[in-house]
């Protein structure tokens, strides 16, 4: 079995690295860390319009390129290497994968094209003040029937939650954990940016007070979808870390070549 990347995948890596070298320098990263939004909208638009990165794994029928998670892993490695400040993980890994795995054809048709084009910033809101990451930790209540519901409760540590135009929320109905789409500017939704240790990745507290929401997928089957998405997210985060570690190794090797100690090169 061959675990090496293909020529096409390495070419993708080369292209993405060149783009990020130009757009995500150390200076640019530090500048974006200090902004409220945490990213450069112009760069985000270029990622979608020129590079097609937001639509990389979105199926072609919804405006994407239809590549696999392997290609996404290559891109994420390079983003980790460059410490890119952008809502890519929240939009492409969390939200888009939730939609893709929801089995909801109407929701995919409605939301994925905007994500693929780089026009929609999206995120996934699951964690609550308890800090629990399992199914029992989801206690937010959803009231309603059919496809129309209202949500009340609080979500914490939502990646890019203060800037997302689409928020996919996990909440409970009488049938169990379900998934809902909420407009980022919906009435009754209060969004508060949080202070984070990793300033390249913004988070927010979201408070819902009878906020209108649209059911995604099958009512009561939300945790099945989330279990898959969380596994994919773990792989995606590991890819970012691999890229970051590779960059650190390269820097250490280069420094070792010029470092002199006690009158001799180390």
For every predicted segment, state its role.
Residues 27-49:
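Short secondary-structure junction/hinge motifs that connect adjacent elements
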Residues 140-143:
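A structural signal for short hydrophobic beta-strand segments in well-ordered beta-sheet cores
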Residues 125, 152-190:
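A short core secondary-structure module
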Residues 9, 20, 75, 104, ...:
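Residue-level signal for inorganic ion chemistry
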Residues 118-129:
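A short, Trp-centered hydrophobic/proline-enriched beta-strand micro-motif
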Residues 48-109, 113-118, 159-166:
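Internal helix-loop-helix
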Residues 66-75, 134-138, 182-183:
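Structural signature of FAD isoalloxazine-binding scaffolds in flavoprotein oxidoreductases
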Residues 2-8, 12, 81, 189-266:
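Glycine-rich beta->alpha junctions and the first turn(s) of the following alpha-helix
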């Amino acid at each position: 079995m061959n675990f090496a990347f293909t020529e096409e995948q390495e070419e993708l890596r080369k292209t993405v690295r060149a783009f990020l070298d130009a757009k995500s320098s150390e200076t640019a990263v530090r500048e974006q860390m200090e902004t409220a939004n945490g990213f450069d909208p112009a760069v985000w638009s270029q990622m979608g319009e020129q590079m097609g990165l937001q639509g990389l794994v979105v199926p072609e029928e919804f405006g994407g390129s239809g590549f696999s998670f392997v290609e996404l892993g290559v891109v994420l490695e390079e983003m980790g290497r460059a410490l890119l400040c952008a809502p890519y993980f929240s939009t492409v890994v969390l939200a888009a994968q939730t939609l893709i795995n929801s089995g909801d054809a109407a929701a995919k048709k409605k939301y994925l094209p905007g994500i693929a084009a780089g026009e929609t910033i999206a995120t996934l809101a699951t964690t609550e003040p308890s800090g629990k990451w399992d199914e029992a930790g989801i206690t937010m209540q959803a009231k309603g029937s059919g496809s129309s519901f209202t949500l009340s409760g609080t979500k914490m540590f939502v990646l890019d939650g203060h800037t997302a135009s689409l928020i996919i929320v996990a909440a409970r109905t009488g049938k169990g954990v379900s998934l809902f789409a909420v407009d980022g500017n919906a009435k009754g939704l209060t969004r508060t940016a949080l202070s984070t240790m990793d300033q390249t990745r913004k988070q927010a507290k979201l408070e819902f007070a009878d906020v209108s929401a649209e059911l995604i997928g099958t009512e009561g089957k939300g945790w099945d979808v989330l279990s898959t998405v969380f596994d994919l997210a773990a792989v995606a985060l590991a890819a970012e870390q691999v890229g970051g570690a590779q960059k650190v190794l390269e820097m250490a090797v280069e420094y070792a070549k010029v470092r002199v100690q006690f009158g001799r090169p180390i």
